C-alpha cells in the first residue's frame, strides 16, 4: 500500500457523492479499509432500541467513513488539490501540486 497522502487533522474537500463540495477536518484515517472519517460529512443514523442503559432508545447520528478516493486535501484557499511527496532537508514532506506549498500535518 502506498504512503498516506491524507492524514488526521487535514482539511479535505469531498469530490463525489451526496456531500460533494463540502469540506471538513479528518477525524480518523482507516488505512486497511482505505477510508477516512470527516467531521460533519456523511452523517448516518443508527436507530437504538430501548435498553436498561438507555431506557428511552432513540436515533444516534454519527460520521460514517468515506472512501479515501472521494476526498482531496484542501489548499490554503480551500480548493481541492492533489498531493505529492518531495524530499526537503533530508525529510519526506507532502506538497500541494497546485500551489507548490508544503502541507503541515
From Swiss-Prot:
Keyword Oxidoreductase attached: no
InterPro entries found in the cross-reference section: KOW, Rib_uL2_dom2, Ribosomal_uL24, Ribosomal_uL24_KOW, Translation_prot_SH3-like_sf
Top-level taxon: Bacteria
GO molecular function, one term: structural constituent of ribosome
Annotated SMART domains: KOW (SM00739)
Record keywords: Ribonucleoprotein, Ribosomal protein, RNA-binding, rRNA-binding
Any one biological process term the GO annotation gives: translation
Record Gene3D superfamilies: 2.30.30.30
Gene Ontology CC entries for this record: ribonucleoprotein complex; ribosome
Listed SUPFAM superfamilies: Translation proteins SH3-like domain (SSF50104)
Protein task: One of two assembly initiator proteins, it binds directly to the 5'-end of the 23S rRNA, where it nucleates assembly of the 50S subunit.
Subunit structure comment from the entry: Part of the 50S ribosomal subunit.
Family: Belongs to the universal ribosomal protein uL24 family.
Protein's recorded name: Large ribosomal subunit protein uL24
